[in-house]
Swiss-Prot record:
This is ATP synthase subunit alpha. ATP binds at G170, D171, R172, Q173, T174, G175, K176, T177. The gene is atpA. Keywords: ATP synthesis, ATP-binding, Cell inner membrane, Cell membrane, CF(1), Hydrogen ion transport, Ion transport, Membrane, Nucleotide-binding, Translocase, Transport. It holds the Pfam family ATP-synt_ab. The keyword Translocase applies. Disulfide bonds: none annotated. Transmembrane segments: none annotated. Produces ATP from ADP in the presence of a proton gradient across the membrane. The alpha chain is a regulatory subunit.
Amino acid sequence: MAQIKADEITALLKEQIANYDAKVRVDEVGTVISLGDGIARLHGLDKCMAGEMLEFPHGVYGMAMNLEEDQVGAVLLGDYTEIREGDQVKRTGQILSVPVGDAMIGRVVNSLGEPIDDKGPIAASDRFPVERLAPGVIDRQPVREPMMTGLKAIDSMIPIGRGQRELIIGDRQTGKTAVALDTIINSKGRDLICVYCAIGQKRSSVAGVVQTLAKHGALDYTVVVVASASEPAPMLYLAPYAATAMAEYFRDNGKHALIIYDDLSKHAVAYRELSLLLRRPPGREAYPGDVFYLHSRLLERSSKLSKEKGGGSLTALPIIETQAGDVSAYIPTNVISITDGQIFLETDLFNSGVRPAVNVGLSVSRVGFSAAIKAIKQVGSTLKLDLAQYRDLAAFAQFGSDLDKATQNQLNRGQRLTELLKQPQFQPLSAEQQVMILFAGTQGFLDDIKVPYIRAFEDGLYKYLDASQRQLLNDIATKKALDDELRGRVKDALNEYKQNFLDEHEDARVKSETAQAAGKDKDEKAAATAGAGK
């Protein structure tokens, strides 16, 4: 039998005690007391923070939203079907954050920044909290740089600047998403990173958007964040904040970013659902009292930073869907008051073939032409007023046929300008192309061309400029303003092209009044002769 030596045991025990490293892990743990509709009520988390991430069983996370006296109301982010009453919940001590960085570009992710495009994991360089304070007044500078959308109707009358918040508002099926996508496609090669945030849309619609962006090469500089209609309300609520955090990474690194929220009406509905399930008191239209703050704290994060902060910018194009054109409803008026202007798209204009269906009278940019390049301002500054006056005159002209010559000229010019501002989808124009065609419209080059030929005139003009006047376009793009010399060259180019166009299309010219009168007399004589013969 082996003899036990006390000194060896003592030595071993002393060694164990000396090497013992006391690591005590303390977790604050609570219990699920009720669960339903994506909302969990928890007991025992006395030191829980508002907005803190909570760890549930089966790898599900939640976010604390209601801090009550004896319990915590949390929203669940993910599949909660396996969680039961009585399950344990742990505090993480962290605020919800999402991955950010250049690796996000070209990817489709959900509200938590997890990839959903089957292209593998994302090696993100950093993580940002979804809720961040907006930059202060000292950290900002005024909006001065233009952000071209490529749409004549917007760039010439409702110019948008980098760092601005411009609302796109209208009924369903009026082309709101199309305007936003055109802006993304037009951003190619303009040093702009785009983030498209789809909130509460059908997966098929989002797939169509992603395919369109890929087809035009726009995914190379775009991040797509998706919270589809089939996902629970907490994911819809988080989506715009997560997307903004991803866009802020580029802004904070001195780059320029554009974010599109499509749309904030569904975001407000998701927040209303969450609030009612959390038993918060309802207000107007059953929305909670802080629904204004919901959108104001989101949209205030879009800004143009000062040079000391890197000079980056984040431009926001939130989308709001109205019901039967009612812009005075609760959510539309809230977002109109938060943003720096709105682009109002009208169903009647859309159905009559005016696309983009921008209602010039109700649309406005509160930054104005300080954000537009000077050449656009020179050719388009009177356009909005001319079109508004044309609409008024057109309404009155229906009641009487005897119009003086000045009124008739104004109506004719208005018809041609309206036709000129129509634009096919996904065909954005450069600033210099817009300057040329708007100059032609506002300076009377189209006054003697029949309205049905305006579209052909415009298409031919772009081909002519590319083939014969490339230097002129380059000079407009470089100078960004029309001086006397450049204005003369523009007129010469337009006169030359117009003559060629009329030679090819002889019936495109409007007959002069003398010729029209002679034709009318001839018709009357022929009718009188025919009557006498009978």
